[in-house]
Amino acid sequence: MSGNQTLDIKNKEFMLVGGLLIVVAGLMAFFPSLNDSDTSVDWISIPLVGFPIIVSAILLAFASQEKRARKEIIAAPIRLFTLCASLIPLAISTSLFFDWLILVDWDLSYNEYALQKKYIWIESIGASWHVGMDGLSFPMVWLTTFLVPVTIVMTWNEKNGATYFPLLLMMGGALIGVFVALDIFLFYVFWELTLIPMFFLILKWGGKDRRYAAQKFFIYTFCASVIMLLGLITLYFLQPEGNGAQYGTVTGRTFDMTVLFSNATAYNMGDNVFLGKDMQNILFAMLMLGFLVKLPAVPFHTWLPDAHVQAPTGGSMLLAGVMLKMGAYGMLRIPIAIFPDALVFYQDVIMAIGLISLVWGAVVCLGQTNLKRMVAYSSVSHMGVILLGIASMQPIGYAAALFMMFAHGIISPMLFAVCGAFKHHYHSMEIGDMRGMARWLSLIHISEPTRLGMI
């Protein structure tokens, strides 16, 4: 490819990104504000969660009916339609995010939810479609809606796009569902839903060892999710039967996080402990195990380097940018909020795991010759920093952990995008194969201050 052709492609990409920013800015004028007087509109269930998942499911069903030759023809319109569909959640979340920054002033309280909506789902067990956003979920929701269209643009020429791009969109919708769910049953449904598109992204568009990496990713995360599910079911059956009675549940129990948090706070007053100290410690350990594998933290991290090395660029961007944050988010949302006494009991253990992850990830990172594996191990180190902030049990530590989650969610996908560019140019991820970069990649040095944390 000649220099003029490369420059022409770059100009088209810059024009496309600039046009997207203009479209998003225009759409923001039509979407909600946190201080709107009309709260009857559900701005979360359909626009942020349901719309991406439904659209992606329709596109996947449509593409699966077409023959292979036909799929290459319909890939271009599906790619463009997927990009346009991803801009609507971005415009909505951007409008809400900036309002939240101004009005809430980074309030990280667990009981101040905006745009909260609740619908009875499975009345017999007390499960509901309950969604809302607070200071913990707002940054993660915006980060997800931002990264999905960016990932689509950065992998614009990916092969088999008729199914690839809808999977990215479905992944985004499932991730948003995790961050806005205020019902434990709903939370777990979206938690498991995120596994499906990522598994197929690695399996179908990955490298030569993609089957091994996809199976390892699925086995690790699914087994951890099963242990977490057992903990959630135990929590459901051990809670006082009057927990959900006032909400019309048949069993008298509930999956509602806000109710569980309120009751746990009330029980923990004085010498009382919600469910008892021993049971708190057991349930806390079961839930934390599931979240530590997803984070991931040492020694549960071995699935991550293989997944990143074999995953396509788009899969790595969403995996590093948002999917890893599900672990830290889940810790703060469920076990730490409901079982604070258990956090005190396990504080030293969690801090030790965080410190080991920080140091081990950094040391192993320095010895890697594969560029994507190097970035993957750096993510393990960064997740250790997040775990240390959580284990501090201080408001400033929680705020620092959330800031690190957000910052890593921006920087890490960009690093994997650069890795994808290197692979496209050198057809290799081995650092020893990358020579002669000074002439055509000199502008990358501009990014060094941000990578080193100097700005």
Question: Where in this protein do the model-derived segments appear?
Answer:
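Hydrophobic "anchor" residues on beta-strands that sit immediately upstream
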Residues: 130, 179, 188
